[in-house]
Amino acid sequence: MGEDTDTRKINHSFLRDHSYVTEADVISTVEFNHTGELLATGDKGGRVVIFQREPESKNAPHSQGEYDVYSTFQSHEPEFDYLKSLEIEEKINKIKWLPQQNAAHSLLSTNDKTIKLWKITERDKRPEGYNLKDEEGKLKDLSTVTSLQVPVLKPMDLMVEVSPRRIFANGHTYHINSISVNSDCETYMSADDLRINLWHLAITDRSFNIVDIKPANMEDLTEVITASEFHPHHCNLFVYSSSKGSLRLCDMRAAALCDKHSKLFEEPEDPSNRSFFSEIISSVSDVKFSHSGRYMLTRDYLTVKVWDLNMEARPIETYQVHDYLRSKLCSLYESDCIFDKFECAWNGSDSVIMTGAYNNFFRMFDRNTKRDVTLEASRESSKPRAVLKPRRVCVGGKRRRDDISVDSLDFTKKILHTAWHPAENIIAIAATNNLYIFQDKVNSDMH
């Protein structure tokens, strides 16, 4: 995979020309739709930007279309909870696309408290020739109307309209960390630190609580929910991860309140590796079902793990993302970096996995060849047709010319949010306030 990934080129990068990064511009989520033709990003300023893939050029039929801005809208505004005297941030925590049912597209976006359903439609025609209205829409003087005409549709410049269809509020006491659309295309779930709710997409005033781990006495609280996702094919199954590093697979057919899991996936801790930071670094920051539905991918602070749904005792694969940080956990704890929540992603065939790291690095692991590569998303590599070169972090004194010392890593540059096109080798990488989109130089599989 190393050699093949070597030849990946940048497709497009969307760079905001700021000499400084404003907090509102920091990208907080990235998500392809089910066809990969649209890509949505959310930021800390509550905005959603949708990119659309351009059609392939007739002059170069084998060249891939690039992604251009399709629509931008303000999804959430800052609010204030007067009962609790708390500010509610406008930051977009998650975006999830709904499967397309007609010409329009729909997506869910959420901040800490409120989930919204948006409809995206196109208009390239407008009616003309009204009998009682003029071109500006004003009513005509009826005495001047002497004939009856049939209104016609005339072409116009393409207009993309985004409208809010539903607002799902008051469902969560704690901060929402994830949303997931069910395969039945009628329901979705939202999870906060202690509860998971099931919603119907057409009903906004009530939801069903399907998981509640809040203890009677909050002093007895030992773990929180960190992420959740529906199974891609079985609408009754979902998984949620915890800050203790465990995964619980639940079946909604068993009970209305899924307090008792169907399966518990947990890796026994090695006593020799026990330290003050063990529990913090074992917290699962993201969980993703494979496209096949057979496996689950989880990310904790130092590793990504692949779990087989049929084997609860331990993961079938473990990949070290940045093991060289193990000796620096103390300083990472002091700077709060140890609490960073990295996401992970599968490629379309479930054969390669991807996750982010520090210094604007991101990692890819080929499950078949067991090869891995470290790549960098940077302004230097953002020129069209630029080739990404593998990077290497060294720990000891000896290092090659292009190696980077672990002591020179920039921990303010972190890639937390990544997404992979559902069918092709196209990836989206959010690096602070910049979005990078990379694709294969040739239309071939990575491995």
From Swiss-Prot:
Keyword list, A-Z: Repeat, WD repeat
Record-linked InterPro entries: PP2A_PR55 (IPR000009), PP2A_PR55_CS (IPR018067), WD40/YVTN_repeat-like_dom_sf (IPR015943), WD40_repeat_dom_sf (IPR036322), WD40_rpt (IPR001680)
Gene3D superfamilies on file: YVTN repeat-like/Quinoprotein amine dehydrogenase
SUPFAM superfamilies: WD40 repeat-like
Tissue-specificity statement: Highly expressed in brain.
Cellular component GO terms held in the UniProt record: cytosol; protein phosphatase type 2A complex
Mapped WD repeat ranges: 22-61, 87-128, 171-209, 220-260, 279-317, 334-375, 410-446
A GO MF term: protein phosphatase regulator activity
Top-rank lineage group of the source organism: Eukaryota
PANTHER family recorded: PROTEIN PHOSPHATASE PP2A REGULATORY SUBUNIT B (PTHR11871)
Function: The B regulatory subunit might modulate substrate selectivity and catalytic activity, and might also direct the localization of the catalytic enzyme to a particular subcellular compartment.
Family listed: Belongs to the phosphatase 2A regulatory subunit B family.
Quaternary context: PP2A consists of a common heterodimeric core enzyme, composed of a 36 kDa catalytic subunit (subunit C) and a 65 kDa constant regulatory subunit (PR65 or subunit A), that associates with a variety of regulatory subunits. Proteins that associate with the core dimer include three families of regulatory subunits B (the R2/B/PR55/B55, R3/B''/PR72/PR130/PR59 and R5/B'/B56 families), the 48 kDa variable regulatory subunit, viral proteins, and cell signaling molecules. Interacts with IER5.
Protein's name according to its UniProt entry: Serine/threonine-protein phosphatase 2A 55 kDa regulatory subunit B gamma isoform
Organism name: Rattus norvegicus (Rat)
Classification lineage: Eukaryota, Metazoa, Chordata, Craniata, Vertebrata
